[in-house]
């Protein structure tokens, strides 16, 4: 994975946070990569729909300030990898669109 702005290849330690949720039967996962060179985030979003087809989208750059706020929400969830989690942080992150 590369920084969307400077194209630097990310290392494993550049993955700052990930969260998964189930929306209309599809699993949606966002992973945040931080580029210390650019001071921005690149977000990689995966959709695994109920038929088993997976798609990926890369978005950004996201400012450090905005990305930090999103990551703060993710870190309030004790199980961000669990697409079935319905804690306040999960609901807030996914704008109350979870199954």
What are these regions (language model features)?
Residues 47-99:
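Short, intrinsically disordered terminal segments enriched in charged and Pro/Gly residues
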Residues 30-32, 39, 91:
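Intrinsically disordered, low-complexity segments enriched in small/polar residues
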Residues 1-28, 32, 44-50, 59-68:
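Short recognition patches in nucleic-acid-associated and regulatory proteins
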Residues 2, 31-34, 73, 81-83:
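Secretory pathway export signals and precursors
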Residues 7, 36-39:
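Cys/His-coordinated zinc-binding microdomains
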